[in-house]
């Protein structure tokens, strides 16, 4: 079928258990973000903007909404006869099917898919990070270094480095050691979970890893250390833009709040590197005569009759009279009644907040699940009814 130079494989099967009720019915990459996107839109858009048009999306946990969102890949120009986007659930063989056992096993189960295109390189991506990145530049770096593997890295604060997989490098960015969440890190170059491998080399390591019954079948824990031990040439590609792992409630809330900063590094208004998504046609937003909106993202289809400060309102959100929303993320089609106070909260899709409620104002980020109804006069603080 091919001789495609590079194939992208997006690992999108994560449950996202640390996101609590937000991922109760959908995979983490399908979680809404930034008013009109889902997390998966970022790696898909990065692929399209980088000219990579053969993409596999490896799904597993609660894939229905994610599959429906991606569809045939039209918003990302991935609806193609040759290549395009393919949804890849765990592989079913004659002896029966298995869940993906780890990130490496997920790619191993799809060797046949990649081989159809006979690529020289394969790009491995996580489906649950928010960032904009030109993968073509990373591929050029990989070629220049004549590497077996190139790993995207980003500098993190030294006091946070022990939370990440850390790459220890020489001056030429060649990697001599990988440490998974070290107690005393030697470096602050954190792995972004973005890898470019020479496909023939990776395929050999995937097969060896699968044959090792003691392996956890993970890129960070098994494949990368194994390649390093064998003397493979591995280099770190430094990335200096905005990047956030939105795997927790706090980081998801913060990433949305980052969009409201005047020096926002993600810049979703950049026409040279657009983030594409599947968006229904909605009427223009309506801001009532007594409404007050400051430093907020208000997406089309919203009706605002109250006060909105430093918040992100997704499509179709309704805000009642005398209601105050502050430092919050209100997801698609949520209905907020009159005389409500919401502060530092994430309100899920289609949630209904009846009038006279108080949600938030405590130390924790308040969460209301998708389609949940909060009854009239309820008070919720630190995720407990008061």
Swiss-Prot record:
GO BP annotations, alphabetical order: glycogen biosynthetic process
Positions binding alpha-D-glucose 1-phosphate in this chain are: 100, 165, 180-181, 191
Name this polypeptide is given: Glucose-1-phosphate adenylyltransferase
Annotated Gene3D superfamilies: Hexapeptide repeat proteins, Spore Coat Polysaccharide Biosynthesis Protein SpsA, Chain A
Q: How does it assemble?
A: Homotetramer.
Q: In which pathway does it act?
A: Glycan biosynthesis; glycogen biosynthesis
Q: Which UniProt keywords apply?
A: ATP-binding, Carbohydrate metabolism, Glycogen biosynthesis, Glycogen metabolism, Nucleotide-binding, Nucleotidyltransferase, Transferase
The record describes the protein's role as: Involved in the biosynthesis of ADP-glucose, a building block required for the elongation reactions to produce glycogen. Catalyzes the reaction between ATP and alpha-D-glucose 1-phosphate (G1P) to produce pyrophosphate and ADP-Glc.
Is this entry keyworded Transferase? yes
Instruction: List the catalysed reactions.
Output: alpha-D-glucose 1-phosphate + ATP + H(+) = ADP-alpha-D-glucose + diphosphate
Q: Which family does it belong to?
A: Belongs to the bacterial/plant glucose-1-phosphate adenylyltransferase family.
GO terms assigned for molecular function: ATP binding; glucose-1-phosphate adenylyltransferase activity
Q: What is its EC number?
A: 2.7.7.27
Give the EC class as a word: transferase
Gene assigned in the entry: glgC
Q: Which domain of life is it from?
A: Bacteria
């Amino acid at each position: 079928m091919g001789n495609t130079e590079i194939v992208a494989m997006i690992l999108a099967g994560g449950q996202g258990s640390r996101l609590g009720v937000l991922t109760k019915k959908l995979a983490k990459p399908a979680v809404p973000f930034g008013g009109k996107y889902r997390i998966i839109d970022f790696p898909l858009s990065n692929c399209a903007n980088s000219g990579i048009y053969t993409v596999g999306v490896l799904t597993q946990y609660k894939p229905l909404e994610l599959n429906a969102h991606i569809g045939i890949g039209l918003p990302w120009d991935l609806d193609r006869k040759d290549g395009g986007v393919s949804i890849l659930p765990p592989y079913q063989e004659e002896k029966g099917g298995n869940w993906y056992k780890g990130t490496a096993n997920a790619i191993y189960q799809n060797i046949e898919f990649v081989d159809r295109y006979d690529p020289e390189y394969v790009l491995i991506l996580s489906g649950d990070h928010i960032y904009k990145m030109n993968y073509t530049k990373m591929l050029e770096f990989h070629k220049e270094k004549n590497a077996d593997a190139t790993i995207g890295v980003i500098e993190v604060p030294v006091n946070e480095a022990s939370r990440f997989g850390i790459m220890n490098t020489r001056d030429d960015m060649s990697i001599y050691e990988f440490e998974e969440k070290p107690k005393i890190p030697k470096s602050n170059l954190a792995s972004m979970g973005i890898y470019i491998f020479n496909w023939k080399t990776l395929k050999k390591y995937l097969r060896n890893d699968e044959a090792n019954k003691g392996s956890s079948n993970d890129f960070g824990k098994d494949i990368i250390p194994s390649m390093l031990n064998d003397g493979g040439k591995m280099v770190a590609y430094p990335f200096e833009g905005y990047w956030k792992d939105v795997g927790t409630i706090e980081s998801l809330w913060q990433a949305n709040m980052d969009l409201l900063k005047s020096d926002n590094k993600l810049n979703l208004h950049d026409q040279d590197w657009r983030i594409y998504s599947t968006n229904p046609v909605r009427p223009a937003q309506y801001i009532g005569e007594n409404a007050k909106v400051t430093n907020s993202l208000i997406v089309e289809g919203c009706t605002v009759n109250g006060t909105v400060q430093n918040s992100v309102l997704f499509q179709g959100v309704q805000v009642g009279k005398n209601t105050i929303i502050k430092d919050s993320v209100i997801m698609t089609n949520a209905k907020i009644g009159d005389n409500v106070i919401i502060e530092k909260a994430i309100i899920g899709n289609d949630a209904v907040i009846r009038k006279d409620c108080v949600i938030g104002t405590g130390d924790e980020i308040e969460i209301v699940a998708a389609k949940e109804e909060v009854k009239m006069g309820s008070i919720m603080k630190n995720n407990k009814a008061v």
